[in-house]
């Protein structure tokens, strides 16, 4: 990357998104890099890390004695949240017996509020030639990712995700989308002042990822990888794309409390180990009093905090999946970046694949081509999954399932968006949900509730080993395969 800091809600750069039933060309990939000014230290908000998985006793009164206010306790994860206007609060609270460290919370801009290109989204009525498929969902022929991972073949064995609960930690969701509503088990927002429902007509990142995992097989638009899994929709990013790590932590903890089997996080940040960060000085709406700080230890402890949350989830039976990031970064060579949450303990990190020109030659195009933007690295990627791409050159037009568009659009992942519509997007954010869907199929095949270590082992044993034999920098242990996964011995 040209800049030292990048973020993702989708993972680092904005995803490429386009939608329309009639072609509207654009040569811009709309993948804007984000400067270091986009990560902001919250001057009066703190994350407390315990030395163990248990919190010190009478923590509220001890926080008060340190001039702080305890705002949340995550018992079992060894984490707590607090606020304080005292600039010396962190130092004071760190001296409490049993406290490992006290760090500031950080906010980041995960994706632009209007990251989609300025086009109309696809609706059911736009389909002038409804296609016939195994499941009869009208836009199923656009879902090349399902073909790549052999999802239909997995369904034919009877494995459809029934009995699995997937928590989707993301931005807002279209809770009334006809292709989603029947599978929604619940929703929750940790974004102050915003409900879980996505407002407006812009691209809905959360709705898109949720649809890939578990859109209902109902003879409508699309179908999810695990169409009978239930979805717990947890909002940890604002509709405008911003988020904080404390919201992420609370979302993970909540998913555990609701007995989720799988967590998908198509979000996060790639932060330099050593860099200057902006502190909002406790006034996030007023930038005139901001200051710049440099605290390498605080970033390292932030990764520890997220790792405590993800480890807590894993210990409580939740398989945690996160997108690897969209910076085309070689994690083996560049050790300066801290990837959160994909680099946290017990997290399964997913890279992205995507075809080039698939709509023009669907039977000849390689669906397992590595996406141009995906992060990679032998220790940074565990599995690959379909994430799409938009690098096909030229103005060729294609038509599939009654939808006519420039050929490059069909190389992206087609799923749900706001106001009951459908759209394309590309990014490792789209890859993670394919892998989470496979994990849900595994849990469902096992009858519900399967130890994360077993889910991981099945995913590893069943992945298609592409690239160099064994674990390689691009595909990890391989591209996930739904059919092979549900065919393993349970």
List where the protein language model places each region.
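Surface-exposed intrinsically disordered loops and tails
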Residues: 127-135, 195-199, 273-301, 330-336, ...
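Hydrolase catalytic cores
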Residues: 210-212, 232-241, 253, 261-262, ...
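C-terminal motif of bacterial Sec signal peptides marking the signal peptidase cleavage site
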Residues: 7-10
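Subtilisin-like serine protease catalytic core
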Residues: 153-188, 194-246, 258-262, 267-274, ...
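Protease zymogen maturation seam
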Residues: 97-165, 173, 178-179, 365
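Active-site-proximal beta-strand/loop segments in catalytic clefts of secreted hydrolases
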Residues: 49-52, 84-85, 104-107, 168-172, ...
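Substrate-binding/access-modulating region of protease and related hydrolase catalytic domains
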Residues: 160-162, 216, 236-346, 357, ...
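Inhibitory N-terminal propeptides of secreted protease zymogens
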Residues: 17-118
